[in-house]
Regions:
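Hydrophobic alpha-helical transmembrane bundles of multi-pass membrane proteins
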Residues: 1-248
Length: 248
């Protein structure tokens, strides 16, 4: 990897990391005022806990040398053997994906989950669910990779994975007592959405792992898609309610 691509991937990794506090603001602005801090911490603590888990064993279970079709190995525990620059860059970028994925799930159970319980869930889910699925699809030994599965920027590993987990979590914790609650802080929601939009340039454009034409195309498509979604939301809101709104 040349110096330009190294710099690009470091920037993209930082952009993806920025998405997690952005998600914290986004979710925090949607819940009731008394639950803002706990909701924000759900996302924010993922940065610390998942970073440690990823370095100690998460990366090794996902991409460890000598893995089989279903799981990696413990050959790279604590990043042992992760010495060359290209591998380190890849491990860092993948760590940012692992951080935001469980944070996405918290929107399904915010206000209804004890923080200590969430910490246990966070460690177990990244270890037992995220790492194996990342291995299946993104590691060259993974069984889905061998079948030709394509996942350029986490559509399956991150979003489908988190979505299914969110559905299961919502079913387990049950319905909200007050499903019609209003957002407590719309500026938080807008700030969070803006940070997510900005971070997505790193998420998508960095997934080619190189500063090249693929990155440029991904950057352009990402911005165009987000802009189109914004305009569509505003138009539908005006049709439905007669006014535009950031939230509903």
């Amino acid at each position: 990897m040349d110096s330009g691509s190294i710099a690009w991937m470091l920037v993209c990794s930082a952009l993806v990391l920025l998405m997690t506090p952005g998600l914290a603001f986004f979710y925090g602005g949607l819940v009731r005022r008394k639950n803002v801090l706990s909701t924000v911490m759900y996302s924010f603590i993922s940065i610390g806990v998942v970073s440690v888990v990823w370095v100690l064993w998460g990366y090794s279970l996902s991409f460890g040398e000598g893995g089989n079709a279903f799981i990696g190995t413990l050959n790279n525990v604590a990043f042992m053997g992760v010495e060359d620059t290209d591998t380190q860059i890849f491990a860092i970028f993948q760590m940012m994906f692992a951080i935001i994925t469980p944070a996405l799930i918290t929107g399904a159970f915010c206000e209804r989950f004890k923080f200590k319980t969430y910490l246990v869930f966070l460690i177990l889910w990244v270890t037992l669910v995220y790492a194996p699925i990342a291995h299946w699809i993104w590691d060259t030994n993974g069984w889905l990779y061998e079948l030709g599965a394509l996942d350029f920027a986490g559509g399956a590993v991150v979003h489908v994975n988190a979505g299914i987990a969110a559905i299961v979590a919502a079913m387990l914790v049950g319905r909200r007592r007050n499903p019609g609650m209003q957002s407590n802080n719309v500026p938080f929601v807008v700030l969070g959405a803006s940070m997510l939009w900005f971070g997505w340039f790193g998420f998508n454009a960095g997934s080619g792992l190189e500063a090249n034409g693929i990155a440029v195309n991904a950057f352009l498509v990402t911005n165009t898609s987000a802009a189109t979604a914004m305009v569509t939301w505003l138009v539908l809101g005006m049709i439905h309610t007669g006014k535009s709104s950031s939230v509903s």
